[in-house]
Amino acid sequence: MGKIILATSIASSLYLTVMLKMLHFFNWIDWHPTKFLHVVDDGLTRWVVLFVILAGASALVYLMLMNIRRVPAIVVGIIFGLAIAFVAEWIIYDLSAEAKSFKRLSIPFIVIITTATVFIAETAIFHREQIEKGNELPYSTSMIK
């Protein structure tokens, strides 16, 4: 179980780190993803630290989404991803709660966060279902032995 969480969080954080670098490189976002890491001097080290932070956050999201039941994983992933993306951009831009603030939101950033969250949700819910299926008895509980 721990290996699955580790592999999923590493894959999603690698995807997010590379995509954030691309968004910043092509100027699709106005902010710098590693600006908050001003304590670290080297640019590559900042990206590595961001990767580690994203890996930890991905593992936490995995553990949270693993406990969701009776809702399709795609729906959970999209809703959770949109919420994370909107909250992140609201905090980054320090936006007010007005309708015109939506124009500042970056669609590519929202899509990237949502796809990563859908990946984590699909993996978490699939593996939880596999664990539950493995815990089932091989016979009916009403069967007389």
Placement of each model-derived feature along the sequence:
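Short juxtamembrane and helix-loop transition motifs at transmembrane-helix boundaries
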Residues: 32-44, 66-74, 120
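Transmembrane alpha-helix boundary/anchor motif
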Residues: 56-63, 115, 119
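Generic low-polarity alpha-helical segments
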Residues: 1-11, 44-48, 61, 65, ...
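Loop-to-transmembrane helix junctions at the membrane interface
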Residues: 58-84
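Hydrophobic transmembrane helix segments
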Residues: 10-54
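Hydrophobic alpha-helical transmembrane segments
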Residues: 5, 48-52, 75-79
